[in-house]
Amino acid sequence: MITPAQLSRLHIDPALADPLNATFIKFKIDTDRKQAAFLGQCGHECGNFKIFEENLNYRAATLMKLWPKRFPTLEIANQYAGNPKKIANMVYANRMGNRDEASGDGYRFRGRGAIQLTGHSGYYHAGQALGVDFVADPDLVATPLYALMTAGWFWSTHGCNELADAMNWVGLTKKINGGTIGLDDRVAHTALALNVFDGSSALA
């Protein structure tokens, strides 16, 4: 069981101890290594458990860098820059179970939670697993309990426990991020958490 004191040492809100422990129990995140990896990966995704909703307030140049196929010119990017709702509805349209841009699904099911659950399909399947209708009330995913529970659901269904046990940090990061963005930071936070848990930081 993780304690509020341990979370304080990791600069994580101690009030998250109970929902974290509930998540760890439900999804069998049951060793120091697994728990440290969960904190390291999710901490990178959500500002060390401080930000449970995706920030989509991007400038035109950033849009062109992040989604070059969707924003091939500055003229197109300028039509969306600084408008998070319009950006989400465009970049997340017709994927991840979302309908077209006009439906509003992109913004409705934008990234939320400790692992940035995104898209209608993710909200639906996480809700089915947890017995909560996240499709009807997507904002629930940004509340502390469900921010962590949905992350635990994703972690469990994507084989992250096994990757953490194997200390496959690259593979684990790819499962969560789709690439290796922030790999060094994720590994560093995992090592820090492991040190707090058992006095070790050995990740290999």
Tell where the protein language model's regions lie, with residue ranges.
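Alpha-helical scaffolds flanking conserved acidic
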Residues: 1, 31-40, 166-172
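Short, mixed-charge amphipathic alpha-helical segments
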Residues: 25-30, 136-142, 164-167
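Non-transmembrane alpha-helical segments in soluble domains
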Residues: 21, 39-42, 151-152, 173, ...
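Peptidoglycan-targeting cell-wall enzymes and recognition modules
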Residues: 2-15, 19, 43-153
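N-terminal carbohydrate-binding/catalytic regions of secreted carbohydrate-active enzymes
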Residues: 10-37
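Acidic helix/loop microenvironments that form the catalytic cleft of cell-wall polysaccharide enzymes
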Residues: 42-45, 164-182
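Low-complexity, Gly/Ser/Thr/Pro-rich intrinsically disordered linker/tail segments
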Residues: 175-204
